[in-house]
């Protein structure tokens, strides 16, 4: 599996605090069959701003430590950007990193409210050639209440990324139910760990993928864990399936 959403850099957000914790998380990810991962620290007002260049430098340092300890996990740079106007300017200025410097941007929505500018921000990103990848849509209250909201964003050209552990209830039963609904309706394009550590939000990848396979079959899971993520890492256009219109 290629993990496209991961908090593993030490001391930058609510992920690991030390390099030792980062290495332990990396080892756990490898044991759960993840061979490559895009590092996506939070890009919001809650944590100190760190430019794309700084994140790349920190990724390089962690990659060297992984190689030193023979942990076979390949890292790429990215951010998880909280939605707001002005993200295009942040990308242009080098403040915000897309996923492995590609056309794809990991975009986080507000959990409890629906930002009125959501569709406009996505439209602005697309106008600049950016494809938004909506992070963990199963956890947003508005989408939990009405999955058609996500379907509208997908029809607008956005992609959606599910957290594997949501499928086994690690984000709560409401998120688990929503995750299954979104999968069945064809609204999920890739799956990721969104791991933050071994204690706080551990990976839960293998069990989540087993549940996804039971719902959709291994072929669909392969699309969401290898083919789609590989297209993102390699900055390639991928022919994503259209959502099931049975709403």
What are these regions (language model features)?
Residues 7-9, 42-43, 78-82, 110-112, ...:
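Active-site beta-loop-alpha junctions enriched in small/polar residues
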Residues 185-202:
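Short acidic/histidine-rich active-site segments
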């Amino acid at each position: 599996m290629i993990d496209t959403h991961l908090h593993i850099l030490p001391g930058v957000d609510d992920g690991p605090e030390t390099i030792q914790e980062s290495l332990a998380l990396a080892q756990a990810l490898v044991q759960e069959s993840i061979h490559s991962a895009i590092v996506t620290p939070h890009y919001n007002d809650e944590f100190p701003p760190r430019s794309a260049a700084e994140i790349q430098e920190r990724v390089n340092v962690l990659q060297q430590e992984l190689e030193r300890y023979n942990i076979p996990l390949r890292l790429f740079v990215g951010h998880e950007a909280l939605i707001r106007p002005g993200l295009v300017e942040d990308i242009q200025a080098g403040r915000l990193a897309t996923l492995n410097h590609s056309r794809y941007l990991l975009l986080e929505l507000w959990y409890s409210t629906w930002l009125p500018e959501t569709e406009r921000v996505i439209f602005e990103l697309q106008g600049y050639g950016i494809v938004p990848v909506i992070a963990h849509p199963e956890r947003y209250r508005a989408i939990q209440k009405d999955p058609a909201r996500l379907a509208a964003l997908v029809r607008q050209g956005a992609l959606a990324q599910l957290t594997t552990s949501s499928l086994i209830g690690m984000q709560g039963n409401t998120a688990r139910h929503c995750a299954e609904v979104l999968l069945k309706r064809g609204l999920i394009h890739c799956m990721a760990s969104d791991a933050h550590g071994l204690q706080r939000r551990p990976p839960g990848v293998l069990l989540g993928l087993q549940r996804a396979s039971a719902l959709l079959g291994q072929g669909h899971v392969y699309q969401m864990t290898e083919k789609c993520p590989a297209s993102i890492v390699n900055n390639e256009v991928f022919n994503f399936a259209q959502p099931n219109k049975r709403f």
